[in-house]
Design a protein with these regions (language model features):
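Terminal targeting signals and extreme-terminal segments of soluble enzymes
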Residues: 1-163
Length: 163
């Protein structure tokens, strides 16, 4: 099985590898020119990023340019990348709108609507559905060129700590 996965990866890299870096650089330049800023990330998210962010009319928006490292064995964006992007962007927005209170995901419902392709620019525009003293309910659609590819709803618990 591992040989099959390695073989599929090698074939995809050969087909898609040439010019991939230029495509990523072009997407990054487009994001910068549209007012996006790089988000400093650490830990697991650092492996998936770079992540981009901007605020438009008070609403937080996030972008991720999909690269070869995000592919599954079918050459499409791996579902875990899409889930992580939805979770992280909902969590970041919840953190900002709550006055930077610490929080943790307690539930994330994810619906895959369409496949993401390597080279796509994923966009997430999370919104608060409801907030209580201990929980905040978030929702987002992950889009590519205004087409919804993922719908996600998350529940986040506020943690004790600096408020």
């Amino acid at each position: 099985m591992l040989d099959y996965i390695k073989s599929a990866h090698d074939e995809m890299t050969e087909v898609a590898g040439h010019g991939r870096s230029a495509m990523i650089d072009k997407a990054a330049a487009k994001l910068k020119s549209d007012g996006w800023k790089l988000v400093e990330t650490t830990g697991f998210l650092h492996l998936i990023g770079p992540l981009w962010q901007r605020v438009v009319d008070g609403a937080h928006e996030y972008a991720l340019v999909t690269e070869d490292k995000h592919h599954n064995r079918n050459g499409l964006v791996q579902g875990g990348v899409l889930m992580t992007f939805a979770d992280r962007t909902c969590g970041m927005t919840a953190h900002y709108v709550s006055g930077k209170r610490p929080l943790a995901t307690v539930q994330l419902d994810t619906h895959f609507v369409e496949a993401g392709k390597i080279g796509d620019i994923l966009i997430s525009r999370p919104r608060v559905v409801r907030s209580t003293r201990s929980l905040i309910f978030m929702s987002t659609e992950v889009t590519v060129d205004d087409r919804c590819i993922v719908m996600a709803n998350g529940v986040f618990k506020f943690l004790k700590g600096p408020e």
